[in-house]
Amino acid sequence: MQSSLKKSLYLGLAALSFAGVAAVSTTASAKSYATAGAYSTLKTDAATRNVEATGTNALYTKPGTVKGAKVVASKATMAKLASSKKSADYFRAYGVKTTNRGSVYYRVVTMDGKYRGYVYGGKSDTAFAGGIKSAETTTKADMPARTTGFYLTDTSKNTLWTAPKYTQYKASKVSLYGVAKDTKFTVDQAATKTREGSLYYHVTATNGSGISGWIYAGKGFSTTATGTQVLGGLSTDKSVTATNDNSVKIVYRTTDGTQVGSNTWVTSTDGTKAGSKVSDKAADQTALEAYINANKPSGYTVTNPNAADATYGNTVYATVSQAATSKVALKVSGTPVTTALTTADANDKVAANDTTANGSSVAGSTVYAAGTKLAQLTTDLTGEKGQVVTLTAIDTDLEDATFTGTTTYYSDLGKAYHYTYTYNKDSAASSNASTQFGSNVTGTLTATLVMGKSTATANGTTWFN
């Protein structure tokens, strides 16, 4: 009897001990999770709540330290979104929760709606930190030299947006009801998509309809181009439907007859007829040839537009060749100029001067270039593959340019110096007598040693090796 009682007591105590351990374990497990406070909707201006991932935290279905939180986008995925070159991968923050541990989690969604969830945002519900940071989805761009007299290139295809697509959450198309092919627009803002770099103009219709919005503007308006300019969805001439009476088909083909592209040029001149020569109106002839050159297939250059005898309703066969683009390899000619320095400073230049001796290279990644004709340089560095470059055009683009080195050097006495450069046209001529498009053009520079730190930011990789 006693033995049976003892055994029952032991079993009872064991059961109680197990239950106690289970209770402690459950309590400890519960304490390992945070609890989230009430959800709050963010009410500040929506554009100020555009953010981008930093790649340091994952995205969850609920605050990440709360029980039941599941991963929506891993830390690795968020890192990819952080380094993305697509505006669609920005986020919009629209809500917030704070845990009992003081951690703030923002409710966010990507601009394309693909990812939505909570991401750790630091310890403040008024500033973005942790897994996200504020983002400027667009960057202000220079206004075009011409702001009036634009038309939609094709009213059936081109449209306006409330914001450049994916730069604001739920950016949408603008209704074009009331817009005709001859509706004029005025440009009142210009911006680029920060990640893609693509240019957009904000335009407003001048017909009193109040219609306005953003539209892709291609390379933007050019002050040097002749004839009609097509800027993405905008044109400097009204939209006209192509017919035999007002258009010329252009076929681009190589010297062996291989077709590599085609296009259609349409005149905005009234009264033209099928079979009549385009050259009957000098302005139209100029516009046609400019169009042929401007709309050539990618990777080709026009060697002969063959447009002299073009007639409306017929085809022009423009001859093209493979194009090649050179870059300029900058080199120092002679010893650096030090005349602007005091005698004491000139004697202290040795440590800095060692890096820029006669014949040394100047990388495009270490120089800031400025000049009124640099925009033309890419065009002048592109030509028919195998042909000798036209150095006179390149000289013209570079001779008024100034170059500032971005590197700061220190002398033996600890003084700061940097270099500025000017283009040496005469030395360049002797170095490029037989340089062909696609090969580096040697650009010789005269270097000047300047006292003080460099504050310039490199921009030279577009044109210079």
From Swiss-Prot:
Annotated signal sequence range: 1-30
Main location class: secreted
Post-translational modification note: Glycosylated.
Keywords for this protein: Cell wall, Glycoprotein, S-layer, Secreted, Signal
Record protein name field: S-layer protein
GO CC entries: extracellular region; S-layer
Localization annotation: Secreted, Cell wall, S-layer
Metal-binding as UniProt keyword: no
Transmembrane stretches, start-end: none
Stated role: S-layer protein. The S-layer is a paracrystalline mono-layered assembly of proteins which coats the surface of bacteria.
